[in-house]
Amino acid sequence: IDALGVIAYNLKKAMGEPFTIGVTGTNGKTSVTKLTAEILKQSFNVSTTIGNFNNDIGLPLSIFKAFNNETDKCVYELGASKKNDISQLVNICEPDMTTLLNVSEAHMQSFGNMENLISTKEEIFSHPRTNQVILNKDDLYYSKWARLNNDKKITTISAKENADYMIKYNNETDFYFTTVKGDFSIDKKYTTGHLPINMLFSVSLAMEAGANIEDVQNGLQSFKGVKGRFYKFISKNKSTVI
């Protein structure tokens, strides 16, 4: 397993070390990673996580399969089931920009307590190459994470207060985004099954990595979601299961 990480690390080095985004959190990792990659794919050659291969085996395999000489952006999901897992993964992919979506109780049997879980997720901020983080001002831990990253560029998002990137309901049919590159709206019909805050994370990550408003709009409209999540099933009696 260690050899996989070393090979993946050296492969990424050999390919010119393209701009890399690392995503972790208890919920939403896969959706945010996939949507961010979809937006960036509108203008860039992107390497991203295969499925939800987010551990010390899956991350190297994703790098092996998706990487090529033309890759200029990477978006990787980083998962953890025990202490130091995230540290190991950031040492493999060396992210330039990271985000910690949220922390809530999950896999507690392997962490022991909430403090261990939180500190493990915070390892996403630890790599010396990481010089920018995206933080949600609405999150309970925002102030703590801002203090941890006072030596980095902090880009903020919010659905409730002033931030670099904001989202709100424009009317019954649109979401309205305020961003550092301008404001725009998108029809809700293109966002079915996406949590607004996850869309905002993806928009901010992609735009900070170089995407423009047109890329965001096209990416949101073309994204088909994560397979097996938020799918609708209509039963014979017409009831709907999601």
Please name every model-derived segment:
Residues I1-G22, S31-V32, A37-E38, Q42, ...:
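Short, basic phosphate-binding NTP loop
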Residues L4-A8, T36, L40, S62-I63, ...:
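Buried hydrophobic packing segments
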Residues P18, M97-I242:
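Acidic, Mg2+-coordinating active-site environments of NTP-dependent enzymes
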Residues F44-G58, N102:
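Short beta-strand-centered segment that lines the nucleotide-binding/catalytic pocket of NTP-utilizing
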Residues I57-T71:
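P-loop NTPase switch/communication element
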Residues K65-N69, N91-C93, S126-P128:
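Conserved catalytic network of the ASCE P-loop NTPase/AAA+ motor domain
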Residues D72-K83, V241-I242:
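Switch II (G3) loop of P-loop NTPases
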Residues S81-I92:
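Switch II of P-loop NTPase G domains
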